[in-house]
Amino acid sequence: MRILGSLPNNIRKCTFKLILQKRYSHTDILKELLYDISDSQKFIPSASPIASNLLRVSSYGKLSSLFIEYSKARSKKEFDQLRTSDFQSILRSVVCPKNGKNIRHRDRDLVSLQIKLILQDADRLGIQFNIVDYTHILRVAMYTGNKHILEYIVARVKEKRIRPSVDYFNAILGVIGGNRWSLSKFQSPAFRGSPVTEPVSGKMLDMIEVDFPNYDLVPNSTTYDYLMVGLSRDGKIREIYDLIDTVWGINENSSSKKVDCGNVTFPTHHTVFSIISALGYLGDVSSAVSLSRKLTSVYKINFPELAWRYIIYWSIASLQFRAPAGHARIKNIELFIRLYSQMYRHCVPIIEIYDTSIKFYMKHGRFGLLEKVCESWTKQFLGSLEKQNNEVKKKHLQLLEKQISKLMRYAETERPHDTKRVSVKWSNVLNQIHSSVGDPAKP
């Protein structure tokens, strides 16, 4: 822009016009690539009032509001003049809130019914969806746990002779085997007992070995992420180790780089999350941490801070599982919290990691470990003050004060002999926090 500003007016206008033309041409090419539209049907941005209204309602995040507005427009027969791009926009606005985490049965049914109505209206109006649209439907089905729609979509794609993509097959794998967010909904094979579940990994392997080659498609890292989750659900821990070793060259004894950066199977942060979730679901959290850290070291990937949320969660959940003993598991949790606070002591701490651990230790009466977690949280909070804005500081300060107050009240009821020491120690800590933040200490 500085160079353009130094040019004469007429030259500057011509140059700027050429730049804009070039930019718009790249934008048009990108739209065609993203939406996979045929030559006879160029992408046109949605501008109809009906579609705009539905997209506005969907942005509020309330599925019931979107369903009501869609039903009203449907009853008035306002969809007859809509373009394909309008229907695509409406379809892709139907998403699963929080990726299916703690979703209510009512919302799950609403999502399924909404998709069913959109497909019916599209068929009635002769609108053809592409593979990206069907992939979106399958992803929504994966997050809602709705397997009934899978056979319908697969049959529909075959009937219309639409060429599948890797993302489409990955979405099918996700519907069959679930994803790492849904593992907590299933009873682990490592649980005390012998849960009976329908095997899923066999179907997933058949798809990777048969369907992918039939369409000259190559599995990518996401494919193996879903496969690890499926193997985990079936309790096949040895197969998970073999998969990690075969694809990425990482095992318990040695590690070697097998995949180059340009390869589609090059591991990502999602691979780290999947390894931790798959092995943590089977109770082997220590191996999950070891293998995932080796993977990030060999492939020069930053060990994601979010991974520690999975580690702490599965460390706590695995206390219900079979061997080893629960006492050793609690020591593991303490170790992982210390590792997390040391590795990210200058980063803004993830509140959920400490909050989850504090609730767990309070429930099981582990007061010594409870104090250590609060100490780790305090140190990391004070060490990361420079990187926090005022809003984040205020939020962290309120939550930390709340947990420390709970700790002091807990000591009064459960450890009356230790009340004085706890009160003096943590009152001083609160004063230190307030003075560091710049907020005057409360009397």
UniProtKB/Swiss-Prot annotation:
User: Which residue ranges traverse the bilayer?
Assistant: none
Instruction: Describe what happens without this gene.
Output: Impairs growth on galactose, leads to low viability on glucose containing G418, and leads to strongly sensitivity to antimycin A on glucose medium.
Output the Gene3D superfamilies linked to this UniProt entry.
Tetratricopeptide repeat domain
What's the name of its gene? ppr6
- Supply the alphabetized keyword list: Mitochondrion, Repeat, Transit peptide
List the subcellular locations. Answer: Mitochondrion
Q: Which residues form a coiled coil?
A: none
**UniProt name for this protein:** Pentatricopeptide repeat-containing protein 6, mitochondrial
Q: Tell me the GO molecular function terms.
A: mRNA binding
Organism per entry: Schizosaccharomyces pombe (strain 972 / ATCC 24843) (Fission yeast)
Q: Name one GO cellular component term.
A: mitochondrion
Point out the transit peptide region.
Answer: 1-13
Q: Where are the PPR repeats?
A: 130-164, 220-254
Mind listing the GO biological process terms from this record?
A: mitochondrial gene expression
Function, please? Mitochondrial RNA-binding protein required for the stability of the atp9 mRNA.
Record keywords: ATP-binding included? no
